[in-house]
Amino acid sequence: LREGVDLSMKLWPQQADNPNRSSQEGAWISAVNGVCGDHLESTGNALAIDMHFSTPEAILDLDAIAAAIPDASPHLVVFVHGLCLSPFSWRRRGARSVGDTLRESRGMTPVYLGYNTGRHISTNGRDLSEQLSSLCEAWPVPVESLSLVGHSMGGLVIRSACWYGEADGAPWLAPLRRVACQGTPHHGAALEKAGSLFDRAMQAVQYVDPLLLGKHRSVGIKDLRHGNLLDEDWAQAGEGD
């Protein structure tokens, strides 16, 4: 499976964070990152998504936020998407998003995180903490309140970021006021657990083992099995568990 992905990616020369990509292309790349993003990253594949912030219009350059968001509010809300999704997933078919509603009704400025969901949740959590510190420091006006909204895996990444942020004394925790999680598997994902049990059962059946695509799940997907948040969680269980 991963060799096939490598071959296919050679036919797609552009970078994962190319600002000229359509939402459909971005969705496809995000799905591939969710399935085997750890492999894309370890092999230096150009389609491995680097963590970044964006608006609905473009990826944010932290050195030019004032120009990109001239009406930035002191009340910042960051949206963190789930497995195999992208910042585009917060706005379905051009409909109004939650971010639009919060901007108009609460005077908040929405920012959307893009990241490789095939990586370990703890790795993304640690990186998110660092990125939030940089975002708050670069914000055009002093941040009075920070809100984080996570969907599915995004909620686990936020919780992981909070843990690592507290351990490091990260400055973004000072303005943090609220965290909202939507459909987050805090106690593990039942579907991923079922898939793991099915794989283990089928491994005992002759000739079936080579066909088990579940064996190729990314480490990000595997972390969902037990709701792993920290390095210690997946290290104790073992990479292959």
Model feature map: region roles:
Residues 1-113, 123, 137-141, 191-200:
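Flexible, membrane-associating and regulatory peripheral segments of lipid-active enzymes
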Residues 19-33, 37, 163-241:
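Helical cap/lid subdomain of alpha/beta-hydrolase-fold lipid enzymes
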Residues 74-77, 145-147, 178:
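Structural motif
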Residues 82, 152, 183:
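Catalytic nucleophile serine of serine hydrolases
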Residues 107, 145, 173-176:
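A generic structural signal for alpha->beta connector loops
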Residues 116, 154, 185:
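Catalytic metal-binding/acid-base residues of hydrolase active sites
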Residues 119-139, 156:
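Alpha/beta-hydrolase active-site loop
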Residues 149-158:
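Gly/Ala-rich beta-loop-alpha elbow adjacent to hydrolase catalytic centers
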